[in-house]
Amino acid sequence: LNERWLVSVLEEGRNGGILHFEGLPSEAAQYIIGSLEGSMMMARSHGGMARFDAATRRLLADFGI
C-alpha cells in the first residue's frame, strides 16, 4: 500500500464529502496502515481472521463508511 496514494484518496474523499475524519490526511493514512498491518499480524498469530475483520469494520466506521 502506497502511503502517498492513500493520503490523496483521503483528501479527495474528505473534499468530496464521502469520508469524514478529523486531523491531517497523512496522520489518518498512518493510522489506517498501522491498524491493518497490526491486525494482519494478530490474525496470523491467532489463527483466524476475526481480529482483522473487527479492525476493518472499525476503520470503516471511523471514516464514516
Q: Where in this protein do the model-derived segments appear?
A:
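All-alpha amphipathic helical-bundle segments outside canonical DNA-binding/catalytic cores
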Residues: N15-Y31
